[in-house]
């Protein structure tokens, strides 16, 4: 009896974990200039996220510095910052290795950045399809989406809202349980 109860509890816990991760995050994508992939549900279920569409040759590209600072400041509170390289606005390097150089060497980014993909419209990758349907597709590079630990898309900020903007920081504090 105890064994079947324990098995039932494990099954219930697995079912609850699966329900906690929404379909749009239940996808596996390749990291920038790498063969390594990330399944967002497996890696980040139950964690708040800041998801950003990025480009290497944009006037907003220096926001990588602030995004890295957010990553460093909030990672211990569970926040996951993820960049999505995209050429939808024609400002990403054609070669992924060059895009990776900008991210990881020039801006010293340590948070995950995904391989170049589309982030808007019918060609959007599954993550941005979900974000776009919930809060609108990005109209330019460096749009920021705040996602709760339950996978709810809480807010969408345009490019002009920088990583240190009070309105963004307030929401990040809310989803991480900070001040």
Which sequence ranges carry the predicted segments?
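Positively charged n-region of N-terminal signal peptides that target proteins for export
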Residues: 1-4
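Cleaved targeting-peptide boundary
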Residues: 19-26
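A short beta-strand-turn-helix
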Residues: 27-48, 69-74
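Amphipathic alpha-helical repeat scaffolds
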Residues: 53-57
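Structural microenvironment flanking redox-active thiols in thiol-disulfide oxidoreductases
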Residues: 60-124
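Thiol-/selenol-based redox modules, centered on thioredoxin-like
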Residues: 126-129, 133-179
């Amino acid at each position: 009896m105890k064994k079947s109860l324990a098995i039932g509890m494990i099954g219930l816990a697995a079912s609850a974990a699966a329900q906690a991760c929404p379909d749009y995050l239940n996808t596996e994508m390749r990291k920038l200039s790498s063969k390594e992939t990330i399944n967002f549900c497996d890696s980040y279920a139950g964690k708040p996220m800041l998801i950003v569409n990025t480009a290497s040759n944009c006037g907003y590209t220096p926001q990588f510095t602030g995004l890295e600072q957010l990553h460093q400041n909030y990672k211990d509170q569970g926040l996951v910052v993820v960049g999505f390289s995209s050429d939808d606005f024609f400002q990403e390097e054609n070669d992924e290795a060059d895009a990776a150089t900008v991210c990881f060497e020039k801006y010293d980014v340590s948070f995950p950045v995904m391989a170049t993909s589309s982030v808007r419209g019918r060609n959007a990758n599954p993550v941005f399809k979900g974000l776009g349907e919930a809060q609108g597709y990005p109209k330019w590079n460096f749009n920021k989406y705040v996602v709760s630990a339950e996978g709810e898309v809480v807010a969408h900020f345009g490019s002009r809202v920088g990583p240190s903007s009070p309105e963004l920081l307030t929401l990040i504090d809310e989803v991480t349980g900070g001040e």
